[in-house]
């Protein structure tokens, strides 16, 4: 219920949770987690999953209509697939704790340029430092336990920037798994004495992080 102070009783807020059977349930920290959609009594979306599911269904319906016009009557469904490569920065926890801007905003708000940035692209696909490699190995194993098929890790263009690429899957599942991936990244980084920065532009003058 939503205690908004309105005239309607809180138990009549009328939000409905529905299990999303198209996305896998999983166990995290001994808790069964079930992906769900949340909508109002009138059908209005109250979450971010419902619009995604409706968009996928609308795309399927209209794409099938066009395909059938071309005479391909044997096609029964059109599904989108996504494999979002997650970019991130790893920063030593001791260094991170010295920067209040990183702590409070997830990015630097002031500072000087480093002596060397991402010139010559020597960090991109370069040798992975042992500490980072240990983090990546641990991260893979944690994600596999949750059914997230992490496949490829490598250094990205900017210093201390890295990337994880999962095996592609349907758009709805990929969106759920990307949320899990970001959460687990931060937990595993902490175990290795580091902080995982997922802000889209944590440092000025070098590449930001995204999903592509």
Predicted regions and their residues:
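Glycine-rich, acidic/polar active-site loops that bind/position phosphate-bearing ligands
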Residues: 1-198, 206-211
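Short, basic/glycine-rich phosphate-binding loops at helix/coil junctions
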Residues: 203
